Design a protein with these regions (language model features):
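Active-site pocket-lining/capping segments in soluble small-molecule metabolic enzymes
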Residues: 1-103, 121-285
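Conserved nucleotide-cofactor-binding alpha/beta core module
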Residues: 105-107
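As written
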Residues: 116-117
């Protein structure tokens, strides 16, 4: 269904592969090659966003060699070993540094630019005010997640399998949306699932910024996380943001945004502002 997104005017995509840490879909090298050939007008990033063990390094190097033969625009990474491999090979990928929670200040990102990082994803766990401040002070392209479930935690351990063995309970631990966990005396539930990479925990609610384009339009990339979405929901959400961006460019966004929000609410998915308007508190001792 990539055609659906391209026809909306969306031109940048993240493709997950066998070396990605979590994903709604995993694409083979042949799949990635075919996609790049079918949509030469688009930019494709490949997510190599795990923290890799030493025994993975040689095969990872070989995989990056294969990516260099394709029309891949960039690599999304978390492990600096990936950046070092690319630098040693002198490949020309855009190297987007995207740890889940670490990109929280401009100074660090400007230093990392000197080390070969060429773009970055801003952490979701800081207020919008701070995200905007970083965008103003960083001298590289930045990506901001604007919609979808939010990463909470992950482990390379098979935590659900271990719990299953200890408890004797039977449940589908591999379904991305079937299991939820909720701490005692807490109002917040989270999705949890397990795959061959480990255990993953994500928010039950979906972050949304459809009505905040006046504030976030200066970011270079606005990212929609489609993990745990049906194909229909993913297309509908992407269409709403695509239409909203066109409306913004045509100077009709302020008039149209209420209609877009009504359509978003009709999807009947749980929505949240995440940390966008939560103030950061510093305790000084």
């Amino acid at each position: 269904r990539l055609y659906d997104y391209v026809s909306m005017g969306i031109d940048t995509f993240i493709l997950e592969c066998e070396y990605s840490f979590y994903a709604p879909y995993y694409y083979s090298l042949e799949d990635i090659k075919t996609i790049c050939q079918q949509y030469p007008q688009c930019h494709f990033y490949v997510a190599l966003n795990a923290l890799y063990d030493e025994h993975d390094i040689e095969t990872l190097k070989n995989y990056i060699d294969e990516l260099s033969k394709l029309s891949i625009y960039g690599i999304i990474f978390e492990d600096f070993g990936v950046l070092q491999i690319v630098k040693d090979k002198q490949y020309s990928f855009d190297m987007m540094y995207a740890p889940e929670t670490l990109n929280t200040n401009a100074m660090t990102l400007n230093v990392l630019k000197e080390q070969g990082v060429t773009s970055a994803q801003i952490a979701r766990v800081i207020p919008l005010e701070e995200q905007l401040l970083i965008q103003q002070q960083v001298n590289m392209p930045l990506m901001l997640q604007v919609h979808g479930v939010e990463y909470i935690a992950a482990s390379k351990r098979a935590l659900l399998s271990n719990y299953q063995k200890a408890s004797g309970l039977e449940f589908d631990k591999e379904s991305q949306t079937r299991l939820t966990i909720q701490a005692r005396n807490s109002d917040y539930a989270f999705h949890i699932y397990e795959d061959q990479k480990g255990t993953h925990i994500f928010s039950f609610t979906r972050l949304y910024m459809l009505d905040l384009l006046n504030q976030i339009h200066h970011f270079d990339y606005l990212y929609i996380e489609t993990l745990m979405m049906s194909e229909e929901e993913a297309v509908e959400v992407a269409s709403l943001y695509s239409d909203a961006l066109k409306s913004f460019e045509n100077h009709t966004y302020d008039r149209d945004v209420k209609a877009y929000m009504r359509l978003l609410y009709q999807l009947k998915t749980p929505l949240t502002r995440g940390f966008l308007f939560v103030q950061t508190v510093y305790k000084l001792e």
